[in-house]
């Protein structure tokens, strides 16, 4: 409140002070550090769609300025870690939604290229190289949205890029790209936050791209595509474009889980989702991708900013309902026992799928 949070460059030093405090107190114990988690998401929901604080709508200029300050906070935190003698792994985690062109029509192939530069590489290129994609920057300058950048900023970003040791990826879904005319859909249609399948509207940037439904993929109740191969696609793209090791910092399925009268939660859909994603991750490793870690989202059900407790991700069920309250007791789901078996077998159980790991 003092200076507007991420809207002010003052936050950069405050964030570095915070990071140094963590490095000083936990540096001898923590060997993997993520500076920022889903910077592209918290800034989009905060300054474009007004769904997260500070609740601003379509504030494009501030959105890109906020992101630049966040990049600087990330970079200076990375440099501080190394200056303090930190020898561990450090990077940022990006919510990656890989894209496929609708078809081989050139304008749709270009729509995919533009989408990737504006929605993916704008962040990952800074983390890995310390530079912004040229075509995307040219577009933002033309629109008047480009951030104000100090002379020394790019040098700091480039120096920090040389010190990160992995690219963090939060992967949930992929998308399709098609050319979007100037009078086409906007980025601000209805987002499915209710779990009513089919309620999400087609979104896009006018004159650039739109994201139609992928007819070849199933979706969750929240209209997120279920695309295990997309995870492999992400890893291959990062390996080829950046040459960095990868940490899968989030991957999981949000669903309407129900507890039976005998306190069982039969979430075979989550087991199948994770199994198929892990198999594709294994293929990515075989193809040369260096994957340092894989983290599922999440261990327990949790309170969502947008969906409350109705959208559940955990291996452990939390007895809490939207309207009726609950005991807050915890119950292990079938997926808990299945994943326990996967870990115990060092992944062998992925290739002999069955619901052996149910609660006793």
Residue ranges with predicted function:
Residues 1-353, 359:
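Active-site region of glycoside hydrolase catalytic domains
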């Amino acid at each position: 409140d003092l200076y507007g949070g991420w809207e002010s460059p003052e936050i950069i030093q405050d964030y570095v002070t915070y990071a140094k405090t963590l490095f000083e107190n936990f540096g001898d114990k923590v060997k993997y550090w993520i500076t920022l988690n889903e910077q592209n998401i918290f800034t989009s929901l905060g300054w474009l769609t007004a769904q997260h604080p500070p609740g601003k709508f379509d504030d494009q200029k501030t959105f890109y300025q906020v992101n630049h300050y966040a990049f600087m906070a990330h970079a200076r935190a990375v440099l501080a870690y190394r200056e303090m003698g930190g020898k561990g792994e450090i990077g940022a985690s990006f919510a990656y939604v890989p894209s496929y062109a609708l078809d081989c029509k050139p304008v749709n192939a270009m729509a995919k290229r533009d989408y990737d530069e504006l929605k993916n590489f704008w962040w990952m290129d800074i983390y890995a190289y310390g530079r912004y994609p040229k075509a995307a920057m040219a577009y933002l300058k033309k629109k008047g949205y480009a951030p104000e950048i100090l002379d020394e900023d790019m040098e700091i970003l480039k120096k920090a890029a040389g010190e990160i040791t992995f690219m963090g990826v939060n992967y949930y879904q992929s998308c399709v790209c098609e050319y979007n005319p100037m009078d086409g859909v906007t980025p601000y249609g209805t987002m499915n936050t209710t779990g009513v399948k089919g309620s999400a509207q087609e979104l896009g940037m006018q004159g650039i791209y739109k994201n139609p439904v992928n007819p070849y993929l199933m979706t969750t109740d929240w209209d997120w595509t279920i695309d295990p191969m997309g995870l492999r696609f992400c890893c291959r793209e990062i390996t080829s474009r950046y040459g960095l090791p990868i940490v899968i910092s989030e991957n999981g399925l949000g669903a309407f889980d129900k507890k039976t009268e005998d306190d069982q939660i039969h979430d075979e859909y989550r087991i199948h989702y994770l199994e198929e994603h892990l198999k594709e991750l294994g293929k990515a490793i075989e193809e040369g991708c260096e994957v340092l870690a894989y983290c599922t989202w999440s261990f327990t059900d949790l309170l969502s900013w947008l969906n409350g407790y109705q959208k559940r991700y955990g291996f452990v069920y939390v007895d809490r309902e939207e309207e009726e309250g609950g005991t807050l007791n915890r119950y292990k789901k079938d997926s808990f026992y299945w994943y326990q078996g996967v870990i115990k077998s060092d992944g062998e159980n992925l290739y002999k799928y069955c619901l052996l790991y149910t609660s006793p």
